[in-house]
Amino acid sequence: MTDLTPREIVSELDRFIIGQKDAKRAVAVALRNRWRRKQLADDLRDEVYPKNILMIGPTGVGKTEISRRLAKLARAPFIKVEATKFTEVGYVGRDVEQIIRDLADAAIVQTRDYMRDEVRARAHKAAEDRVITAIAGEDAREGTREMFRKKLKSGELDDTVIELEVADGANPMPMFEIPGQPGGNMGMMNLGDLFGKAFAGRTTRKKLRVADSYEILIGEEADKLLDDELVNKTALEAVEQNGIVFLDEIDKVCARSDARGADVSREGVQRDLLPLIEGTTVSTKYGPIKTDHILFIASGAFHIAKPSDLLPELQGRLPIRVELRALTEEDFVRILTETDNALTLQYTALMGTENVAVTFTPDGIAALAHIAAEVNQSVENIGARRLYTVMERVFEELSFTAPDRSGEAVTVDAGFVDTNLGELTRSTDLSRYVL
């Protein structure tokens, strides 16, 4: 669980997302409240429930990106799901309880990784011993083993090929579908999971370079040092106390006020979400999970439906509402220059692999931002995603000819942008279909 302050969380999000101060502050406070709750006495801790968040804003303004970056910061079990993937209980498809089962799966993997890091030093020593045994043989004297250990540490043996017995990761048992539960993996039953330990311990012989064998062996030795029961217990506790679920596209399961007739994937899904968000117990293959203290962050563009079209009970369970504003031309300039993962940096690096040096001038960046904002206004506002389209069109010719232009330097200025995009931007009909 992260112990970053709200200010630190916001400044971390600022590295990747421009603007949207309210949304960043809301998720930062929600994340910090998880830490605050952990500091409370046990009896009070159970009474403090998370305040779930509803993010409202047009497409392409950073809702999903906030969730993605939050997942990396949280150091807590986190899952992002689209509400449109689920159907009402009783119909073919995934029901919403699968969200918690997927969250538990993610938590097990995350917890195992953290615990592996804790025993890595001991696992490294055991892996080293196995490599030395493979090179020097079982009966080698201590002096010989020490000689090989020194060579191993100096890197002299990195290219030596050795034969090792490593765990066989292939699943010996097939998966089969449970009748009446078709579709996806949700109706699949893995016999390997059922019979678990009966098939554990299967090994296979592999020839590997010493340098390549280390990670495999360290992973194996770390797993031997871990207690599976403790991993499961710790992971389930982390899900119950610190889990975060990001529900994207929540507006797509709104039944519009003027719509008529039943819709399997809409109102029923909302009804099924109610107990999940309020607090219920979901059974998973690792054990039951209480969802009372899991934080839910829902988001949607609400382009056609309105937040008031959600079931009143669901609105009540998402008490904190945050509006994200549409992006302006100035925002696009900042997105292209200030973020750590700016498209300008990405294209410069991509062309650099072909030995073509690309540089962007301020007027070139301003031209890109202006075109993106203009097309968003005249055609359809898809936010920052429009920059992908514009950049791809500008670089189309260069991307194709880059291998033949090795060693050249290309400057992306207003003239370069106009040459590659001018005709399209002047014709609204063309930009409607191409940009």
Swiss-Prot record:
Protein name: ATP-dependent protease ATPase subunit HslU
Family assignment from sequence similarity: Belongs to the ClpX chaperone family. HslU subfamily.
Gene: hslU
GO cellular component labels: HslUV protease complex
A Pfam family annotated for this UniProt entry: AAA_2
SMART domains per the UniProt record, alphabetical: AAA, ClpB_D2-small
UniProt cross-references to Gene3D superfamilies, sorted A to Z: 1.10.8.60, P-loop containing nucleotide triphosphate hydrolases
Molecular function GO terms recorded: ATP binding; ATP hydrolysis activity; peptidase activity; proteasome-activating activity
Main location: cytoplasm
Function noted in UniProt: ATPase subunit of a proteasome-like degradation complex; this subunit has chaperone activity. The binding of ATP and its subsequent hydrolysis by HslU are essential for unfolding of protein substrates subsequently hydrolyzed by HslV. HslU recognizes the N-terminal part of its protein substrates and unfolds these before they are guided to HslV for hydrolysis.
Compartment annotation: Cytoplasm
Residues the record lists as binding ATP: 18, 60-65, 248, 313, 385
Keyword flag Mitochondrion: no
Organism: Ruegeria pomeroyi (strain ATCC 700808 / DSM 15171 / DSS-3) (Silicibacter pomeroyi)
Description of how the protein assembles with itself and partners: A double ring-shaped homohexamer of HslV is capped on each side by a ring-shaped HslU homohexamer. The assembly of the HslU/HslV complex is dependent on binding of ATP.
Keywords: ATP-binding, Chaperone, Cytoplasm, Nucleotide-binding
GO biological process, one term: proteolysis involved in protein catabolic process
Highest taxon, organism lineage: Bacteria
